[in-house]
């Protein structure tokens, strides 16, 4: 087991490719724009985010992602097999593209736009004023 602790004053993104391992934030990251991209990787990603824009993408592979905190705008993208759980990440605007086989979970306040091109569902809590959905596969948009 290898554990690496990284301490930085700010962090704008994380890129993971062909890797196996977990990522966990011990404290909340406050940043105007953050991006996570995971390609062909396994592991559990646990993020704590505040403010700004968050783009979280599991391009392929079985990595699972869980995020908490508050952000202004959330972009979620997934083609893999992993679960993306952002129920504890409140966001004003959520833009979702689920092409994968597992569920995405979000908590939008104002806007929810979900494109579902796979068998994975998009689950949401709250009562966003604007909801737009495009379902071209067996996955559905489901209110919890």
Range-by-range predicted roles:
Residues 1:
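Second-shell loop/turn segments in exported
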Residues 4, 11-144:
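Extended, compositionally simple hydrophobic/Ser/Thr-rich segments
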